[in-house]
Swiss-Prot record:
Protein residues bound to uracil: I193, G198, D199, A200
Regulation: Allosterically activated by GTP.
Family note: Belongs to the UPRTase family.
Gene transcribed to yield this protein: upp
Entries under Pfam families matching the protein: UPRTase
An MF annotation (GO) of this entry: magnesium ion binding
Catalytic activity of the protein: UMP + diphosphate = 5-phospho-alpha-D-ribose 1-diphosphate + uracil
Organism listed in the record: Pseudomonas paraeruginosa (strain DSM 24068 / PA7) (Pseudomonas aeruginosa (strain PA7))
Pathway(s): Pyrimidine metabolism; UMP biosynthesis via salvage pathway; UMP from uracil: step 1/1
Protein name as annotated: Uracil phosphoribosyltransferase
Cofactor: how bound: Binds 1 Mg(2+) ion per subunit. The magnesium is bound as Mg-PRPP.
EC number: 2.4.2.9
Amino acid sequence: MPVHEIRHPLIRHKLGLMRRADISTKNFRELAQEVGALLTYEATKDLPLEQYEIPGWAGPVTVEKISGKKITVVPILRAGIGMLDGVLSLVPGAKVSAVGVARNEETLEARTYLEKLAPDIAERRSLIIDPMLATGGSMVATIDLLKKAGSKEIRAMVLVAAPEGIEAVRQAHPDVIIYTASIDEKLDENGYIIPGLGDAGDKIFGTKQKEA
């Protein structure tokens, strides 16, 4: 399973700002969108193109457009919403397929409680977005759901990933490609990524934050 850690200078700079313990909700939210957009650039670099002719100012001109499968963006609720606008800024025509996954804080197991998928998801490339890939439970549950719905080409974009989460996805779904801004050190005893970002959902929505 390919894992792409995107070490672009802009991503490294923005991710460094996001790691600050005293970052404001506004700044964290804006940076999540910006890094999400930059990851989208990488995750769509291999989209197929086809040529066609248009009337140009000096006569007919041959240009290119994206061909083949279209895209559906799949935010894992709730934190994935924080990356959605950044992704849609590059692929504004994409459909949004929302998946709600809750994690049991004691067992760390994931439970799916919502699915609103594009009706033609089998004909689209699915881009899952979630700020954190920690234990991998939420990601694996989401991929399970998408494949059951007929999705055949699935990619995941996360801001930070733990090795444990990457391995969980690799074991369950070796065909899924992961794009991340950083592969961090490890998980702590509570299942939080170290050094991580803290609780990304709380920081995006301005609710109570937890230490990570």
